[in-house]
Amino acid sequence: VTGARQTGKTSVLRHTFPGHRFVSLDLPSEAELAESAPEDFFARHPAPLIIDEVQYAPALFRHLKVRIDAERGASGQWLLSGSQRFPLMREVGDSLAGRIGLVELDTLSDSEVRASIPGTDALSWIVRGGFPELWAHPDIDAREFQRAYVVSYLERDLRSRLQVTNLRSFERFLRACALRSGQLLNKSDVARDVGVSVPTVTSWLGALETSGMVALLEPWFENGTRALTRSPKLYFRDTGLLLALVNVRDAAALADSPLCGPIFETAVYGTLRRALELRGELDSLVFVRRAQHEVDFVLHRGGRFDLFECKWTEVPDPRDAQTMQRVVELLGVSNVERRFIVCRCRHKTRIDAACEVVPLEALPEVL
C-alpha cells in the first residue's frame, strides 16, 4: 500500500487485518535491523506481519522474495506500506514482481467524506481537503495541520532523499507549483521564478510526485498517441493542502480568489483520479489542447471519448458548450460519446441536447 503521508495507510491495514503483527521502520533501530540483518528482523517479527514505511529498508525486499517463494500457498503473510512511491516501486519491480498486489491510497474523496459526515458539501471538502485526521477531528485547524505537514515533509523526506540543503528555495518551489495547479507546466518559468536550474526543477518535481503530493496529466493528440515531449498539466493531489500553500483560508476567500477556477479544476481532477484508479482506468485520462482550444479532461476508451470541462459557476454559459464543440470536431464527431460541464450546480441538467451539466458530487456516477 503506497500513498502520501497521513492518508491512512497504517490505519487501513491495522483495521482490516487485526490479526497481523505490526512493526514500523520509521523507528531507526527497526530500520537498521531490517536493512543490515533481515533474518534477525524476521525472527523478531514473524508472519503474519504488517511492515510500515518499508522504503527505509530496501534490502528487505530480496529476503521477502525468498520467503514468499518458499510459502507460495500462504497469501497475505506480509503487508507492506510506504510513503515514497517511486523508490518503493523500483524495489518491488526488481525483487517482488508477480508476487504482490499494489494499492495506492489517496486522501479521502468528496463522496467518502459525505458518506461519513452527512450534510458535508463538495465546497467544504475542497477547502478542508481529504486528510482523514481533519475529518475525524473537526476541531483541528486545517491550515495549521497542513502547514505542519509541509514542514514535516520538507524536513523528513527531502533532507534524506534529495540532500536539499536550501529548504527555503524548495519551499518557494513548492509554492510556485501550487500557483500553477490546474495549468500547463513550464519548467523554465518555474526555474526562473524560484531562482534554480531547470534540471533542479525536474529533480524536485520528481520528489513531489514520489511523495504523492502532485500528479502530472499528459496531453492527447489526434494521432492517438501521448505527446510525451509536450507540456503536461500539473495538479496537486489534495485541494486542502493546495489552498494552504496559496494562502486561501476558507470558502469566502476561495470565491474571491483569482485562482478559484484552477483550484476547482484541481478538485475535479482529484475526483476523476480517485474514481478511475478504483476501476483501473487512470491511464484513460488525458487533456486536449490545440490552437488555443482546450477541454480540461478527456476519457478515451476503445477509440471513444468522453469530454469534461470545469467551470467555477453555478450556472454554466451556453458558450462553454460551443467551445467544447471545436474540440469535438478535432476528435471527430462520431468518436465523441458524451460531453459534460462540471460545475457548482446542485443537480444534473443539460445545457443543450449534446452536453450534460453535472455537480462535482455526481461526477463519479457518470463515469
Predicted regions and their residues:
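Accessory nucleic acid-recognition modules appended to NTPase machines
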Residues: 139-305
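Conserved lysine of the Walker
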Residues: 9
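Active-site ExK catalytic segment of metal-dependent nucleases
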Residues: 300-316
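Short regulatory helix/loop adjacent to the ATP-binding pocket of P-loop NTPases
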Residues: 86-101, 118
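Short glycine-rich substrate-engagement loop in P-loop NTPases that contacts/grips substrate
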Residues: 20-48
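Domain-level recognition of nuclease-like catalytic cores that cleave nucleotide substrates
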Residues: 107, 117, 344-367
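Hydrophobic positions on the alpha1 helix immediately C-terminal to the Walker A/P-loop
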Residues: 12
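Conserved catalytic/switch belt of AAA+ P-loop NTPases
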Residues: 61-80, 84, 94
